[in-house]
Amino acid sequence: MSTVTTTASAVESKVVDLRGMWIGLATLNVFYLIVRIYEQVFGWRAGLDSFAPEFQTYWMSILWTEIPLELVSGLGLAGWLWKTRDRNLSAVTPREEMRRLVTLVQWLVVYAVAIYWGASFFTEQDGTWHMTVIRDTDFTPSHIIEFYMSYPIYSVIAVGSFFYARTRIPYFAQGYSLAFLIVAIGPFLIIPNVGLNEWGHTFWFREELFVAPLHWGFVFFGWMALGVFGVVLQILGRVHAILGKEGSALLT
């Protein structure tokens, strides 16, 4: 009964409502700007000697806080999306399905920006840090933000977008989209690759060359984010099917 009521009430909502996306983007960007300012201030003041008490205060405290918080957030988001899933997807109207497809696109936009911050901005920044500072720990200020904050954050958003599609959209609920699996799991696999990377730098290859074979895993898994184009093609195909020939003709 609740599912039917939810579906019926959703029909009255707007098909295109971008407020969620703008709120998500604003929150993400403001958060990372604050993080970047924090890095600039305390990276030099308290981030050069891992044995100093201030390093424990300003940096390791972040590490021990962010890891369990991100894990709980990812599991909680997936659990909530599954618990509140639409159990009668066959009753979803074309208009409501279109609204949900638009919402999925918004998830993907926020995911793309999160990947930019993690896999581009903070990753390139880490290269600058290595060229400037001789590190005495694997948990440098740059790594604490890059590996253990920005990567898990975009992974949590990937989990959200994947579970949203699987639990709300009939097309993606029919099976597993290979493109969606690639775009969601590929960049996430950079995180276990971090372990290989740090082990390699400790016992094998200490030079921080970005073109070194030890770093190829970052590129391989990072480029899997391009699977988003496959997901977009699937979304557009479904939009075309919902609109029909007459509706599609109006857009050309």
Regions found by a protein language model. Give the residues of each.
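C-terminal transmembrane-bundle signature of multipass membrane proteins
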Residues: 177-252
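Perimembrane loop-to-helix junctions flanking transmembrane segments
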Residues: 41-61
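Interfacial helix-start motif at the membrane-water boundary
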Residues: 55-75, 103-107
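Membrane-proximal helix-loop-helix units in multi-pass membrane proteins
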Residues: 110-175
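Alpha-helical transmembrane segments of multi-pass membrane proteins
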Residues: 26-44
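Short aromatic-rich membrane-water interface segments that cap or initiate transmembrane helices
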Residues: 54-66, 135-149, 210-219
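Hydrophobic cores of alpha-helical transmembrane segments in multi-pass inner/ER membrane proteins
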Residues: 1, 66-82, 148-161, 218-238
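Alpha-helical transmembrane segments and their helix-start/interface "positive-inside/aromatic belt" motifs
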Residues: 2-28, 94-109, 168-182, 236
